[in-house]
């Protein structure tokens, strides 16, 4: 198995290098971690109550899939299966896009003339939102290019949406702005409720 954030490239490489043993390879992605990396950042309970996505393909041996599922469950994880392409599309939205937003926001503000004051007066919300901008730049550089197509589609959708907010503010479209915020709050509250079940 593996722990990569993008599955399509890993599956392609494994198919080209493992040959007849490819059937024993079970692509996996634990949805757990922090912005820290390296051995010194290891956590013994990292996978407890976190989801691990397996993306078995047509050639994947059921016995290998069962073994890897048992391994992750023994580490305390909740194991689910997804199609390779669907995994990459979902993760582009839920993981890769948020990292791009955090990196872009911090880089943008750090380039402003008032940056010292901006960071001096930044509070908890800013810290929460930008924590992942402290993630490993090289790793995220590679993730961007590994999941390029899905990430570009997601960035385009987000760009359209953020532009609608900009236009609503410019044109004083109070109801449009308030409805956007209400929909977002409702979706976030639902996410929290389901996550804490």
Residue ranges with predicted function:
Residues 180-197:
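Rossmann-like nucleotide/phosphate-binding core characteristic of flavoprotein oxidoreductases
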Residues 115-184:
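Interdomain hinge/lid region at the active-site interface
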Residues 41-46, 141-142:
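Short, flexible, solvent-exposed loop/turn segments with mixed acidic/basic and small polar residues
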